[in-house]
Design a protein with these regions (language model features):
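A short, N-terminal "cap"/entry segment at the start of jelly-roll beta-barrel domains
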Residues: 1-38, 53
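Ligand-binding loop in jelly-roll beta-barrel domains
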Residues: 92-114
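Short, surface-exposed secondary-structure edge patches
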Residues: 43, 63, 77-81
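Conserved short histidine dyad/triad with adjacent acidic residue
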Residues: 28-30, 42-58, 92
Length: 114
């Protein structure tokens, strides 16, 4: 399967669930396109002042791969700064969050695996 950029759906989410502020999600692949082996494969843009609040992963795992910018993350209560090229894996039963306190957008790839 080849999917061209013009076929990638973009959604904006604001102050909903774990999201504080506004984020943009490029839904690169849908669960059906991944044969239901993953539930998310998105490029997320996190503007300055926005965050995805700490949340657990139960019966799944999530990967964040930073593409652009600088983000503050928590990994099971430990706070760290991540930059382009850095990756975080949150396994089953673990908690994480990501926030943008910089003056520039943060872009990252987010993938939830089953």
């Amino acid at each position: 399967m080849i999917k061209y950029s013009q076929d990638i759906r973009v959604e904006t989410v604001e102050n909903s669930g774990n999201i504080e502020g506004r984020i943009s999600k490029n839904i690169v692949l849908t669960p059906a396109e991944m044969l239901e082996r993953a539930s998310m494969f998105n490029i997320i843009t996190l503007p300055s002042g926005s965050r995805i609040k700490e949340h657990p992963h139960i019966d799944d795992a999530e990967i964040y791969y930073i593409l652009e910018g600088e983000a503050e993350v928590t990994d099971n209560g430990r706070t760290a700064i991540m930059r382009a090229g850095d990756v975080m894996f949150t396994g089953n039963g673990d908690c994480h969050s990501i926030a943008n306190h910089s003056g520039k957008d943060v872009k990252f790839l987010a993938c939830i695996l089953h």
